[in-house]
Amino acid sequence: HGKGFGVDALNADNHSWVLSRMAVEFDCQPGQYTDYTIATWINEYGRVLSTRNFTLTDAAGNEFGRAVTQWAMIDLRSRSALDLSWVGDAHADAIVDAPSPTDKPRKIRDVDPAQTAVHKVVYSDIDFNRHVNTMRYIEMMIDMLPLEMLMQEAPVRLDIHFLRECRYGQTLAVGYEQRGLTALFE
């Protein structure tokens, strides 16, 4: 993460990257101890968001997962998003002319939760930006799903939009609604 816009360089100016949206797909669940390779590239900068892509391939070269993530740069003091207009020109050499491996995160419709879990944010939930880590959100959602659904070997897609930060000491309510084969959370 060099080129002047990695986390270390940004933190020196009280800026950081935060995940705004993500879409992750897995064709299958990799077995324990599976060797895999992650490839990543940036293919787009907009005024507010940067798009970073990922693919996961097994040792035989078969792709079994992919992701499109969209990141905002924030001012750590005000916690507000910064204008990224300058990044595209200043760091044009970091942009790879390759398409995203899947669709960008889909719009999430209104959720009518049938079940809600309340969680007080503790130290182990937060990351270096001092807000809840993405994996903790995913764990909270997965923990609400029926075990039978989790044990299925069906392809999985996660679309997540982070609308606001949740920080240490705050209370987070995760709502869950099942619509057919689709699990929706808010």
Cite the ranges covered by each PLM segment.
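Catalytic strand-loop segment that frames the active site of acyl-thioester-processing enzymes
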Residues: H1, Q70-R79, L84-M151
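HotDog/MaoC-like acyl-thioester-processing domains
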Residues: A23-R109, F162, C166-G169, E177-E186
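Short coil/loop residues immediately preceding or within conserved phosphate-binding loops
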Residues: R21, T51, T116, Y123, ...
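Structured core of small recognition/catalytic domains
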Residues: F128-E186
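Hydrophobic, proline/glycine-rich low-complexity stretches
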Residues: H1-D35, L145
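A broad, structural micro-motif
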Residues: W17-L19, F64, V132
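A short, polar/charged loop/turn motif at coil->beta-strand junctions and beta-hairpin connectors
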Residues: D13, V18, V111-P113, A154
